Design a protein with these regions (language model features):
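Generic preference for well-ordered secondary structure
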Residues: 18, 34, 146, 181-185
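Conserved alpha-helical "signature site"
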Residues: 164, 174-206
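Bacterial c-di-GMP phosphodiesterase EAL domain
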Residues: 1-71, 78-88, 92, 199-206
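The catalytic core of metal-dependent phosphodiesterases that act on cyclic dinucleotides
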Residues: 66-177
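Short, well-ordered helical secondary-structure segments
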Residues: 37-39, 158, 188
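General structural signal for secondary-structure boundaries
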Residues: 6, 53, 130-133, 179-181
Length: 206
């Protein structure tokens, strides 16, 4: 489960910018929902990818969410430079039991990010720019503990092709959010709606 791919597109929906949904530079998007609903409800106990920024990486994550650390994968990108201050912070988070992932790295960035990549559990690769066969050889030799994830998958056809090729552990992109209209079924209300209603009813101000 990934909060990164669940984010709203503010270019297409500019009105969302006025909701204060992501206010607070040190607040990490997604942790409040994990704290409120629990990992079992959100992802059936599986790992959850949570994006962090070059500022929120220094936040007290445990204070924002007390979920099991090993179930939370903190996702960084190339806006976090591979300098000592950030490498040390990533080491601290790793020692606390959190898992780490990185995305938006070009092949030319790999060498500069060597110390960062040593700490990563996952790396999200742009499947349109990086050949998986070469990536498997590179990471297999230098970073054998990293699991490869295919990113930026737009269509179900691309997903099926990449799955057939193999080499990736996870797949991320728009493909799984496209509605499939084959057949008909009844969809149960989202459990989160019940939790929200219960919280409102139990509120002292209700």
């Amino acid at each position: 489960y990934s909060f990164f791919t669940q984010r709203e597109n503010y270019l297409l929906n500019p009105l969302l910018l006025g909701t204060a949904q992501f206010d607070g530079a040190s607040q990490i998007t997604g942790l409040e929902l994990i704290q409120k609903m629990g990992i079992d409800t959100l992802s059936q106990g599986k790992e959850i990818f949570v994006p962090i920024t070059n500022i929120s990486i220094f936040a007290d994550i445990t204070e924002q969410c007390d979920a099991p650390h090993e179930k939370i994968v903190l996702l960084i990108d190339n806006t976090i430079p591979p300098i000592e201050m950030y490498v040390n912070r990533l080491k601290e988070l790793k020692q606390q039991g959190y898992k780490l992932a990185i995305r938006k790295l070009a092949v030319s960035d790999f060498e500069n990010y060597r110390e960062v990549l040593k700490l990563m559990d996952y790396v999200l690769l742009n499947n349109r720019k990086i050949a998986i066969d070469k990536a498997k050889i590179y990471f297999g030799k230098l970073f054998p503990n990293i699991s490869l994830c295919a990113g930026n998958i737009d269509t179900m056809e691309d997903f099926e092709r990449l799955k057939e090729t193999g080499g990736y552990r996870f797949y991320e992109g728009k493909f799984y959010r496209v509605p499939i209209t084959k057949g008909q079924t009844d969809v149960a209300p989202l459990k989160g709606n019940y939790i929200d209603l219960l919280n409102i009813v139990n509120s002292p101000d209700f």
